């Protein structure tokens, strides 16, 4: 049984850092484990221009504690009004690495998102020419579609027609949750990749309802059936370069999770690599973790691998039950429980 594993320093290809005091609270957790992260643009107001991304990047770097090394990889928030000129500026910037598609209303702070993908075709065509990736929250928002089916229907209604029209557009299917999405990415022609979270590798939808409502397991896309979780584990541990690590760590104040209308999102930045190690260990695939966490993402984005390392040791330790979060607290996924791996 492997007791210790040293891997190339990993990156997080899907992260929510928030802003202000919340940013200052959570950024060190990510920087301790990851060299770089794709930073989501769904602030209020959203990051829709290169100038806004540059300002947000400066705030992130200003919040980084002295002595810590971390590179934020910025993204823009795609809207119906995003133009080709903004895409050209993004590609030329050197710090914008993707554009995020949120279907309007699909998740936290997505109200300004896309109402009709066809309205975005001029921007998407510019992205295809520039080689700038489109990062997709792959769920339809049609209220007639069951929440557990929204990813599969998105493939049919949006992803397949989009990639038929733009076969060379680089696309990341973010935080996939179904066997449908895993198979789509595995079988797709052209430049398609996918991020997978630790919580979707470890849990099925029963986790939300065990003994009562468990709000800290509620995220979007929502956890799915066990058959889907198993398909995600198979994809992540397959060795395919198309699948890579994206925590989708999404901090919310405790009072906004434990609430009559609680926010969606799991906070995992503090212990992300421990959770991924647990998932890969359970699958008997620790030897596949380094490629998933450290190699596949840089290869897709055309970036060099990191030069540092991170070591994971089999060691029991208790995760804090809650963490400081501005003037309040947040609860990490599995807060107060014992974890079996420790990252150093």
Curated annotation (Swiss-Prot):
GO terms for molecular function: dihydroorotase activity; zinc ion binding. Keywords: Hydrolase, Metal-binding, Pyrimidine biosynthesis, Zinc. The keyword Repeat does not apply. One of its GO terms (biological process) is 'de novo' pyrimidine nucleobase biosynthetic process. Binds 2 Zn(2+) ions per subunit. It catalyses: (S)-dihydroorotate + H2O = N-carbamoyl-L-aspartate + H(+). The active site is at 248. CDD domains: DHOase. Its cofactor is Zn(2+). NCBIfam families: pyrC_dimer. This is Dihydroorotase.
């Amino acid at each position: 049984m492997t007791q210790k594993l040293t891997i190339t320093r990993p990156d997080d290809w899907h992260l929510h850092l928030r802003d202000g005091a919340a940013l200052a609270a959570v950024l060190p957790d990510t920087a301790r484990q990851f060299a770089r992260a794709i930073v989501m643009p769904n602030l209020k107001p959203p990051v829709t221009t290169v100038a806004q991304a540059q300002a947000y990047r400066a705030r992130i770097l200003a919040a980084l504690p002295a002595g810590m090394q971390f590179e934020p990889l910025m993204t823009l928030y795609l809207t119906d009004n995003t133009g080709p000129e903004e895409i050209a500026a993004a590609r030329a910037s050197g710090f914008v690495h993707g554009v995020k598609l949120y279907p309007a209303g699909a998740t936290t702070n997505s109200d300004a998102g896309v109402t009709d993908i066809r309205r975005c075709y001029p921007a998407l065509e510019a992205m295809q020419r520039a080689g700038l990736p489109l990062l997709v929250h792959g769920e339809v928002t049609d209220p007639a579609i069951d929440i557990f089916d929204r990813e599969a229907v998105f493939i049919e209604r949006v992803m397949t027609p989009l990639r038929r029209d733009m076969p060379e557009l680089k696309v990341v299917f973010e935080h996939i949750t179904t066997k449908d999405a895993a198979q789509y990415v595995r079988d797709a022609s052209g430049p398609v990749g996918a991020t997978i979270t630790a919580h979707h590798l470890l849990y099925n939808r029963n986790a939300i309802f065990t003994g009562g409502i468990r709000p800290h397991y509620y995220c979007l896309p929502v956890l799915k059936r066990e058959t889907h979780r198993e398909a995600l584990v198979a994809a992540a541990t397959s060795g395919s370069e198309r699948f890579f690590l994206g925590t989708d760590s999404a901090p919310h104040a405790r009072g906004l999770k434990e609430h009559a209308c609680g926010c969606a999102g799991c906070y995992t930045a503090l212990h992300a690599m421990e959770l991924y190690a647990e998932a890969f260990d359970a699958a008997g695939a620790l030897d596949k973790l380094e490629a998933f966490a450290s190699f596949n993402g840089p290869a897709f984005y055309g970036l060099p691998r990191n030069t540092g390392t991170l070591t994971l040791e089999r060691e029991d330790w208790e995760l804090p039950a809650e963490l400081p979060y501005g003037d309040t607290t947040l609860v990490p996924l599995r807060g107060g429980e014992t974890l079996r791996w420790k990252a150093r």
